[in-house]
A protein has these predicted regions:
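Low-complexity, disordered linker/stalk regions enriched in Pro/Thr/Ser/Gly
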Residues: 16-125
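C-terminal motif of bacterial Sec signal peptides marking the signal peptidase cleavage site
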Residues: 11-14
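Sec-dependent signal peptide recognition
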Residues: 2-7
Length: 262
């Protein structure tokens, strides 16, 4: 009886010992197992300010069999694939957050490695579209805001926009918030569909607060996608910034928008 209990206890003990494949480095039960990890080799460092609208990152995993995916500003941009670098273009002004994650063939995943960085590619006073780029499908509507960037004592703005009606339609053009802080303002749109263009004239009519400074939205446009392709929405012709006494303000840069329709 004692022998039976002895062998039974040995049997129960051995059943509790975790089993693993000695030759499998991906088995988490293996004492030699190393969890997946990723290291970013190149790209902006934490909180760096970059002065271009594009950025490149490269990374490496702790095992050559790994696949990777990456994120920008909380959005998955590329799912699991055999990639180790990326060039991100058409970045908007301001703060961004890049992240990359690795995975073993067994689907064990690493922690996501993040880098925060800032884009300051546009020197004001300038006109620019936000966002710079929309990815869309046929029939979808997307919204662009037209910003006055880093202006001082701006009282009026006039700009002309060109686009391709074969690829997109302009569904609406409305006033932004920048001049709405004044008691009175005007917002006039001259749209010529035959010329694939429209012109906006907007101004403050308030004698108490005749101008604004900083960065803000002059206009908002809603665009509907007609067909596949890349559509450039550009500033053209005479574009003007004016101060309180109708003084001309130089526009240093004019940056349009892009719609890529699939």
């Amino acid at each position: 009886m004692r022998k039976f209990l002895f062998f039974a206890s040995i049997f129960l003990y051995t059943c509790d010992i975790p089993t693993f494949e000695v030759d499998n480095p991906y088995d988490p039960q293996n004492p030699s197992y190393v969890a997946p990890s990723v290291t970013i080799n190149s790209g902006p460092i934490e909180n760096e300010i970059i002065t271009t609208d594009n950025v490149a990152f490269t990374w490496i995993g702790n095992n050559e069999t790994m696949t990777f995916r990456y994120f920008l500003d909380g959005n998955l941009k590329q799912d699991w694939d055999d990639i180790s670098s990326v060039l991100i273009q058409y970045l908007d002004e301001g703060a961004h957050k890049f992240g990359v994650q690795g995975r073993y063939p067994t689907e064990d995943v690493s922690d996501t490695v993040f880098v925060n960085f800032n884009v300051n590619a546009v020197l004001g006073p300038s006109l620019l579209f936000y966002p710079r780029k929309h990815d869309a499908v046929i029939g979808e509507e997307v919204t662009f805001q037209i910003f006055a960037e880093e202006v001082i004592d701006l009282s009026a703005a006039e700009f002309t926009i060109n686009y391709n009606t074969t690829l997109i339609n302009i569904e609406s053009i409305t006033q932004g918030d920048l001049f709405k802080t004044a008691n009175q303002s005007i917002f006039y749109v001259d749209q010529d569909p035959l010329q694939d263009s429209f012109t906006v004239l907007t101004a403050i009519l308030d004698g108490i607060s005749p101008s604004v400074s900083g960065t803000g939205v002059l206009a908002e446009i809603v665009v509907k996608i007609n067909s596949q392709g890349t559509s450039n929405i550009t500033f053209s012709g005479v574009n003007k910034f004016r101060g309180p006494n109708n003084t001309a303000i130089e526009i240093r840069e004019k940056i349009g928008g892009i719609v890529i329709a699939k």
